[in-house]
């Protein structure tokens, strides 16, 4: 199991806001090892973990993380970005959607935002808390956010003590450039 640098930064953001998490409905997409979702569950949130329905190994990694962290009751569902599936339709409204480094391949960006848009219609006040590793100055979400009627706030890493090369005595996030984003519906769409 590998923990990506962005997962540690998102977990730090969750830890900084841990007092607001109990009872919140939280979905982690592209969860993998599920560090942010596991932490949210440990802080009292009602968490659902998800990864690609096309990659059963990834779903098994989510389940293993739950077992290793004494959270066998957490629901793990297969979701494929951009596809409306029965599992996606069955999800209850969420308060927060977690996404650690899901904006990895530009060809997936719109499918991710389409899935988020669908979930936002279940609860227009839901927020996407996402960490993003800058891999190319040419990649941007701005046009797609506008297209999907969403807005984005960049959260300074120093505002939640994540502006270091190591967090929680780990070597992560290292020297990677990571951004913390909070994405929601644009104001005029509410």
Swiss-Prot record:
GO terms, biological process: cognition; epigenetic programing of male pronucleus; epigenetic programming in the zygotic pronuclei; epigenetic regulation of gene expression; methylation; positive regulation of transcription by RNA polymerase II
Main localization category: nucleus
InterPro entries reported in the protein's UniProt record: Methyltransf_16, SAM-dependent_MTases_sf
Localisation: Nucleus; Cytoplasm
Catalytic activity: L-arginyl-[protein] + 2 S-adenosyl-L-methionine = N(omega),N(omega)-dimethyl-L-arginyl-[protein] + 2 S-adenosyl-L-homocysteine + 2 H(+)
One cellular-component annotation, GO: male pronucleus
Single annotated GO MF: protein-arginine omega-N asymmetric methyltransferase activity
CDD domains (UniProt xref): AdoMet_MTases
EC number assigned by the record: 2.1.1.319
Signal peptide: none
Self-association state and partner proteins as the record states: Interacts with HSPA5, HSP90B1, TUBULIN, UGGT1 and UGGT2. Interacts with TET3. Interacts with STPG4.
Function field: Histone methyltransferase that dimethylates histone H3 at 'Arg-17', forming asymmetric dimethylarginine (H3R17me2a), leading to activate transcription via chromatin remodeling. Maternal factor involved in epigenetic chromatin reprogramming of the paternal genome in the zygote: mediates H3R17me2a, promoting histone H3.3 incorporation in the male pronucleus, leading to TET3 recruitment and subsequent DNA demethylation.
Family affiliation: Belongs to the methyltransferase superfamily. METTL23 family.
Disease implicated: Intellectual developmental disorder, autosomal recessive 44: A disorder characterized by significantly below average general intellectual functioning associated with impairments in adaptive behavior and manifested during the developmental period. MRT44 manifestations include mild to severe cognitive impairment, delayed psychomotor development, seizures in some patients, and dysmorphic features.
UniProt name for this protein: Histone-arginine methyltransferase METTL23
Organism annotation: Homo sapiens
Classification lineage: Eukaryota, Metazoa, Chordata, Craniata, Vertebrata
Gene label: METTL23
């Amino acid at each position: 199991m590998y923990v990506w640098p962005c997962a540690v930064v998102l977990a730090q953001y969750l830890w900084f806001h841990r007092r607001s998490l109990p009872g919140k409905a939280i979905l982690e997409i592209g969860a993998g090892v599920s560090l942010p979702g596991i932490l949210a569950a440990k802080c009292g949130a009602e968490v659902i973990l998800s990864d690609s329905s096309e990659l059963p190994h990834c779903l098994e990694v989510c389940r293993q993380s739950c077992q290793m962290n004494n959270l066998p009751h957490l629901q793990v569902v297969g979701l494929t970005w951009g596809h409306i599936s029965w599992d996606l339709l069955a999800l209850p409204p969420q308060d927060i959607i977690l996404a650690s480094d899901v904006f990895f391949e530009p060809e997936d960006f719109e499918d991710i935002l389409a899935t988020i848009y669908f979930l936002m219609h279940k609860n227009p006040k839901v927020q996407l808390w996402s960490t993003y590793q800058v891999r190319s100055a040419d990649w941007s979400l701005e046009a797609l956010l506008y297209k999907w009627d969403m807005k984005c706030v960049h959260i300074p890493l120093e505002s939640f003590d994540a502006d270091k090369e190591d967090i929680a005595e780990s070597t992560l996030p290292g020297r990677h450039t990571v951004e913390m984003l909070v994405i929601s519906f644009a104001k005029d769409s509410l």
